[in-house]
């Protein structure tokens, strides 16, 4: 079963170089052993060091980029409307499109994935008002995380986020049962 973590709205702007703190700030139940590992190739875009716990944030790649992304998100943010409008598939077909349609008030929930818990977009999203994220690791992957972003100011937001996670759990269970089957069987 997925144990997603909902970010807590006490997320404070990052004013530390402690890489462990910034991840625990948005994903408190991350396993301690995660920080004893060497940064993977995707983490290395944002941090440098022998282990994640001893790493330093890269100024341009993480700190400045997060600041730029947060400023952009704030300009695109709008209060939640009473009724959501239909969106086109193209609007939400990219990670940015997925979270952008949520923060701009076009829909109550979206999902995307990141390749690192140090991804600046993830940290910027967690600082927006009335926006929350649930984070869980993708099955069969040591570095992909699924982010379910939703609006707290809409009753549909967390409800849809929880339903998405429930359906994802079912998919995981089915894929586990079919793990030894041929790809053709898995498609059906």
From Swiss-Prot:
Localization (cell): Secreted; Host cytoplasm; Host nucleus
GO cellular component: extracellular region; host cell cytoplasm; host cell nucleus
Transmembrane annotation, as ranges: none
Coiled-coil intervals: none
InterPro entries tied to this protein: NleE/OspZ (IPR048901)
Keywords (A to Z) from UniProt: Host cytoplasm, Host nucleus, Plasmid, Secreted, Virulence
Function: Inactive effector protein: in contrast to other members of the family, does not have the ability to inhibit host cell NF-kappa-B activation. Probably lacks cysteine S-methyltransferase activity due to its inability to bind S-adenosyl-L-methionine at the C-terminus.
Family classification: Belongs to the NleE/OspZ family.
Protein name in the entry: Inactive cysteine S-methyltransferase OspZ
Organism of derivation: Shigella flexneri
């Amino acid at each position: 079963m997925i144990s997603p973590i909902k970010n807590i709205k006490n997320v404070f702007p990052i004013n530390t170089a402690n890489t462990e703190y910034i991840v625990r700030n948005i994903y408190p139940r991350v396993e301690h052993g995660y920080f004893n590992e060497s940064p993977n190739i995707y983490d290395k875009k944002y941090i440098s060091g022998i282990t994640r716990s001893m790493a330093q944030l890269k100024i341009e790649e993480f700190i400045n980029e997060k600041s730029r992304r947060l400023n952009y998100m704030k300009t695109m943010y709008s209060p939640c409307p009473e009724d959501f409008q239909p969106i086109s598939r193209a609007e939400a077909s990219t990670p940015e499109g997925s979270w952008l349609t949520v923060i701009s008030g076009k829909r109550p929930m979206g999902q995307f994935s990141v390749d690192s818990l140090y991804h600046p977009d993830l940290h910027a999203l967690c600082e927006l008002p009335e926006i929350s994220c649930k984070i869980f690791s993708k099955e069969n992957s040591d570095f992909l995380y699924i982010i379910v972003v939703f609006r707290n100011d809409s009753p549909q937001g967390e409800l849809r986020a929880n339903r998405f996670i429930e359906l994802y759990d079912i998919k995981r269970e089915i894929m586990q049962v079919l793990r030894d089957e041929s790809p053709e069987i898995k498609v059906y």
